[in-house]
Regions:
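C-terminal catalytic "cap/lid" subdomain
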Residues: 1-208
């Protein structure tokens, strides 16, 4: 970007470029996946030390819940980078969590606005804000499976047991969305889109 992009910025008022594309380690062209264009904007903003970034969506901004499942949702006028990453990581599809990280690194504000109502303020994502603690947010996730583990000898679920469980979850490439533990049990909630649950159970059956 230093040899191609930055020199153009010095001679042009506006640069139009594509997003969503990248390349593999061996140089082959590929795509960045869901919301890859937003991620591209975050990377370019980081590289050029942009004052701010605006992403245009078909929604008025980031909401505290999905309006498909919840009535009376509230638009979040401003939230912190941390809150935005949490919401997007666990299911809020307006932005991708990777979009936020390069902006957070240089404290570049991110505006999420509606192209249907372009004059509305939308949501600004920036450094820590008091609004995070005032409005609760809700994530609805479908197709979830719940696993509950108890040691065979009813011994306490301590750090060693939890570490063993997560080692196996990592081995089978399973992503945990929610955890809960008590004295003798440990539960995890995961997406129900893996084909190797039985293999996981086989690895766990000797101890749990």
């Amino acid at each position: 970007y230093k040899t191609v992009f930055v020199p153009r910025l010095e001679t042009c008022d506006v640069i139009i470029t594509q997003g969503f594309t990248g390349h593999t380690k061996d140089g082959k062209t590929t795509t960045l996946g869901r919301e890859g264009s937003d991620y591209s904007a975050g990377i370019l903003a980081f590289c050029t030390n942009a004052e701010d970034v605006t992403i245009w969506k078909d929604v008025p901004g980031m909401l505290n819940a999905d309006p498909k499942w919840f009535d009376d949702t509230i638009k979040l006028d401003q939230i912190s980078f941390k809150e935005a990453i949490e919401l997007s990581y666990y299911g809020a599809s307006v932005i991708h969590p990777k979009t936020v990280k390069p902006l957070q690194n240089k404290n570049i504000p991110l505006y999420v606005k509606s192209f249907i109502q372009p004059n509305e303020p939308g949501t600004v994502i920036q450094a820590s804000t008091e609004m995070d603690s005032l409005i609760p947010s809700f994530i609805f996730k479908m197709k979830q499976v719940l696993f509950s583990f108890t040691t065979k000898d009813f011994s306490f679920i301590v750090e060693r047991n939890i570490s063993d469980i997560f080692d196996l979850l990592h081995k089978h490439k399973m992503k945990v969305n929610l955890i809960q533990n008590s004295a003798i049990s440990f539960s995890v909630c995961m997406d129900d889109d893996y084909n190797n649950f039985q293999n996981l159970l086989e690895d766990l059956k000797d101890k749990f």
